[in-house]
Swiss-Prot record:
MF GO annotations: rRNA (cytosine-N4-)-methyltransferase activity
Entry keywords, A to Z: Cytoplasm, Methyltransferase, rRNA processing, S-adenosyl-L-methionine, Transferase
Source species taxonomy: Bacteria, Pseudomonadati, Pseudomonadota, Gammaproteobacteria, Enterobacterales
Gene3D superfamilies in alphabetical order: Putative methyltransferase TM0872, insert domain, Vaccinia Virus protein VP39
Protein name, entry field: Ribosomal RNA small subunit methyltransferase H
GO cellular component: cytoplasm
Organism, scientific name: Yersinia enterocolitica serotype O:8 / biotype 1B (strain NCTC 13174 / 8081)
UniProt: S-adenosyl-L-methionine binding residues: 42-44, 62, 86, 108, 115
């Protein structure tokens, strides 16, 4: 999610990645019911509302208290917002008795620009602030707390699995040794330690890039959240309802791609296995069809470099 805004007041300035493309892919119906699973600062929500008719409805979700505060500027009666993780979207829809009636779900994955740009959130190695990294600072433990209690093996696993960090063991050892003598509580402390412990620097990439991504993903259970959100979207979508998902790195995109691919196939039956038509029907069929994939145009990347790695994928719910 890259939704650039400088403040959390009424003076919003949006640079949502693939804004028009992501919303257009939902095929907005005048009287449709839509979910923006990642409100951020409302770039996608506002565009969806502008395309809905008087009977349309938009339900937004975000676990960041600052996003919930930002949503107060939208007074449109067709709009409502839920404070919570998007992984629980099916639960929210069940409570509203709208399962099977949702015409589109939009998910803009990852960390947002306001989160990255606010030093107090602790997401960025470029700005010194508390070593937090929680998308909802009221829940769970901070990055600093986790790094203090985690073993070198656990830290190395996180750096390797979620950051694809080639020097994971070396960096994990340095983190644990530092915390034994002088616990780290600031982002700059962690970024400097990683930079000093890294034996190799990639061109045009800070040595702490992969590690900060990995720790953030782990602290927020981001990949598990995505998997649950996709399952939830499939549960609540109406026939011909659309799923529109923007991802920002290969781990996210792999989950989305594999989910769409898996649900776009019918039951996998070994050749020659004797099954009746009734048995085949009982195994279920395809529930999604892939509608397409898009990358940001060069002009958008030039204007907003954070869009460079984004991938937008669409799928449509099939009638059962």
């Amino acid at each position: 999610m890259v939704d650039n805004n400088k403040t959390v007041d009424n003076n919003y300035k949006h640079t949502s990645v693939l804004l028009d493309e992501a919303v257009n892919g939902l095929n907005i119906r005048d009287n449709g019911i839509y979910i923006d699973g990642t409100f951020g600062r409302g770039g996608h929500s506002r565009l969806i509302l502008s395309q809905l008719g008087p009977e349309g409805r938009l339900i937004a979700i975000d676990r960041d208290p600052q996003a919930i505060e930002a949503a107060k500027s939208i007074t449109d009666p067709r709009f409502s917002i839920v404070h919570g993780p998007f992984s629980d979207l099916a639960h929210y829809v069940r409570e509203l008795n709208l399962v099977g009636r949702i015409n589109g779900v939009l998910l803009d994955l990852g960390v947002s620009s306001p989160q990255l740009d606010d030093p107090e959130r602790g997401f960025s190695f470029m700005r010194d602030g508390p070593l937090d990294m929680r998308m909802d600072p009221t829940r769970g433990i901070s990055a600093a707390e986790w790094l203090m209690k985690a073993s070198a093996d656990d830290i190395a696993w996180v750096l390797k699995t979620f950051g694809e960090e080639r020097f994971a063991k070396r960096l994990a050892k340095a983190i644990v040794e530092r915390n034994l003598t002088q616990p780290m509580t600031r982002t700059k402390e962690l970024a400097d330690l990683i930079a000093n412990a890294s034996p190799f620097r990639e061109k045009h990439k800070h040595p702490a890039t992969r590690s900060f991504q990995a720790i953030r993903i782990y602290i927020n259970s981001e990949l598990e959240e995505i998997e649950r959100a996709l399952d939830g979207a499939l549960e609540v979508l109406a026939p011909e309802g659309r799923l529109s998902v923007i991802s920002f790195h290969s781990l996210e995109d792999r989950i989305v791609k594999n989910f769409i691919r898996h649900h776009s196939r019918g039951p996998q039956v070994p050749a020659g296995l004797p099954l009746t038509e009734a048995q085949l029907r009982s195994m279920g069929g395809r529930t999604l069809k892939s509608v397409g994939k898009m990358m940001p145009p060069d002009a958008e990347v030039a204007e907003n470099p954070r869009a460079r790695s984004s991938v937008l994928r669409f799928a449509e719910r099939i009638k059962e």
